């Protein structure tokens, strides 16, 4: 997956590795533009769960693994709910719910919500983090019912 680099490689938390230019790229979501090439190549979709590190696979519940049936997307239901400000249990629950309710109407609502969030600059970071916290087994809630349709 093609992506602009906004952090330095190496040890340390995201705040220490995030460059000044990278912070501006992430705030504006311009770091995602190269991923349009991935969409054109068929490796990603416009809408779908955001790609996550392979190391997270072992942490998913059976229900959360539903996200793996779909191509990763530029924008997903979890991002539409608040980008990086969405906590992991809710993010994974929303990704699983999206995988079970695919529709053009839902995709259009997700794209609109993501556009509004990007323009507003909301949700770029999780509270207390330079980006978002890493996923760990402690952050995953038991499987839950999909959120109510609204």
Question: What is each stretch, according to the model?
Answer:
Residues 1-150:
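Conserved small/aromatic sequence motifs within transmembrane helices
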